[in-house]
Amino acid sequence: MALATIVILETSALVVQMEVITRIRSWLFNHALPVWTEKCMDSRFGGPVESFSLDGDRPFTDAYKRTFVVARQLYVMSHASLLGEKKAGPLADALFEYLRKVCWRGPESGWVHKVTLEGDILDPTADLYDFAFCVFALSWYYRLTENSDALTLVHQTLDIVGRDFAHPSGNGYYNQLPANLPRQQNPHMHLMEGLLAFWEVTNDSRAKDMSNGLAALFRRQLFDKAAGAMPEFFDDFLNPIADSTRNHIEAGHQFEWAWILARHQQLSGQDHTDIVRTLVLNAERFGLHETRGWTMNSNKLDTSSQDRGSRTW
């Protein structure tokens, strides 16, 4: 009887899972991608459109383009093409050309943060968040095309990260150059996401080593075991800032780290089951709106709600 109950529950869960996957795939291919492949590119200045009005019909007249937005769109079109979206491949090619020709300053300086519509440098800041998304997007584009220029750009980007962003203590990386405070967990998270994508497609030894180092850093420094949560901001030694007016928790980032660590477990064989479970269960406990069900933007350090709004990411 108990075994039959387990089988029924597992079968029901599988049916629900397949229904969710079907709904997501339908939304992606029948609604999102048809709009995005038609409207994502800036026909006047090149590169992607930065933002749309709420009706999805009129792009805002933003006076800039940010490197990480270009990279995110390159990832979307690369992955979409791999999933069979026919219009996405040429868009990925165009986005790759824009990224490397407009946003890249060369192997000594790397990626700029922001350019004008005309493609001139507007903000030359070297930001690890941008570098991380470029590693991620270029890895996916290489997976799609095996373009050797994309491979070279990833290696050159990681050269800069290792040479210029690495903290002298060996504990993680600076957010930006020149270095500033507070230090943040978020660029580390997205860097690991990019490294895992590069590791998976190339089996690159440096991507393995850096990913393993970031997984260890998360367990050792970024995750607060006592609270079962992860603060966003840290001092120069990666001690969490205790002032609740200057720090907070984001459940969305806990969900992201859970996925990243689960993926690292698949690639490395290291067991993160305990911390993945803790991240998800605690984020669901304190980070979901009690009636709407959405992931709230932020919580205070004691996990009480702070910003009850939600972003779609």
Name every feature range the model reports, one short phrase each.
Residues 2-313:
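Glycan-recognition and catalytic cores of secretory/periplasmic carbohydrate-active enzymes
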